[in-house]
């Protein structure tokens, strides 16, 4: 069988794919992405409601009031949990539970005395924040 120019043109990409080494199963290829760390300026006493422990997640969309209003209207966001820093907080169950899952910020009281919470201390659990 003779190779025609059409078959030769089709065979070249196939050979290129077959010659590419595959990543072994179980080994993930590490791809570095140039992402600048985001800074969130929080006043912990005002960003997290007092009286409870809270897990907080940063919401970039909330910086746009039109989008935030639309999300609240659609019932996607709870307006009571959104503050001016663009952070939405949800309460943790008592007693002091510090597992925030995939949230960005953990908030806990500086003085963990039940009934006497002077301010909340929010710390980042996301290295990009």
UniProtKB/Swiss-Prot annotation:
Disulfide bonds join 48-106, 55-100, 56-89, 107-122. GO terms for cellular component: extracellular region; fungal-type cell wall. It comes from the Eukaryota. It is found in: Secreted; Secreted, Cell wall. Pfam families: Hydrophobin (PF01185). One of its GO terms (molecular function) is structural constituent of cell wall. Aerial growth, conidiation, and dispersal of filamentous fungi in the environment rely upon a capability of their secreting small amphipathic proteins called hydrophobins (HPBs) with low sequence identity. Class I can self-assemble into an outermost layer of rodlet bundles on aerial cell surfaces, conferring cellular hydrophobicity that supports fungal growth, development and dispersal; whereas Class II form highly ordered films at water-air interfaces through intermolecular interactions but contribute nothing to the rodlet structure. This is Class I hydrophobin 11. It comes from Pleurotus ostreatus (strain PC15).
